[in-house]
């Protein structure tokens, strides 16, 4: 199994991850916004404080995550996100062990972090629950395709 680590994201990570993005993440991004994988990653990279990249040895970006401030003047709320490639599976045990630490790192300055997730994405929903997120409501017609999404929050 490959060794992994997390580092601050670099602009070129967006195109590398986008070209190999997991089909579940591609479907979720499309259903939510009709954005391409590259557009979604670039938006997250530009607006996150800070964006972080998950690396598989030797130096292969396999995921990116961050939190985007949602409040003006008083940054107490953030949208949290993560997108990845199938290669994240190669560092899955380390990823799971370190997930809670990195969640604290990217959300420590906020009172509340939240987002929505495609209801079809059962694996990610289980992971969010394991991280301590609460699923607060189903949105039956979210995004341009009016797909069912679930809003989640961590306070």
Regions found by a protein language model. Give the residues of each.
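Conserved acetyl-CoA binding element of GNAT-fold acetyltransferases
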Residues: 75-89, 94, 150
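Conserved GNAT-fold acetyl-CoA-binding loop/helix
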Residues: 25-42
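A short helix-loop-beta-strand connector motif used in the catalytic cores of GNAT acetyltransferases and
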Residues: 41-54, 63, 111
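Conserved beta-strand in the GNAT
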Residues: 53, 59-70, 78-79
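Conserved acetyl-CoA-binding loop-helix of GNAT-fold acetyltransferases
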Residues: 91-105, 126, 130
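C-terminal "cap" of GNAT-fold acetyltransferases
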Residues: 141-155
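A short beta-loop-alpha structural element at the N-terminal edge
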Residues: 3-19, 28-30
């Amino acid at each position: 199994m490959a060794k992994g680590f997390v580092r601050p994201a670099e602009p070129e990570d967006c195109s590398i991850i986008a070209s190999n993005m997991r089909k579940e993440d591609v479907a979720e991004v499309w259903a939510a916004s009709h954005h391409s994988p590259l557009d979604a990653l670039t938006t997250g990279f530009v607006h996150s404080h800070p964006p972080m990249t998950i690396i598989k040895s030797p130096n292969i970006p396999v995921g990116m995550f961050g939190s985007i401030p949602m409040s003006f003047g008083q940054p107490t709320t953030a949208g949290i996100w993560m997108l990845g490639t199938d290669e994240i599976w190669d560092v899955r045990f380390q990823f799971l062990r370190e997930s809670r630490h990195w969640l604290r790192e990217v959300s420590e300055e906020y009172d509340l972090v939240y987002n929505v997730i495609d209801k079809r994405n059962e694996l990610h929903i289980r992971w969010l629950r394991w991280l301590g997120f609460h699923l607060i409501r189903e949105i039956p017609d979210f995004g341009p395709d009016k797909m069912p999404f679930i809003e989640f929050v961590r306070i």
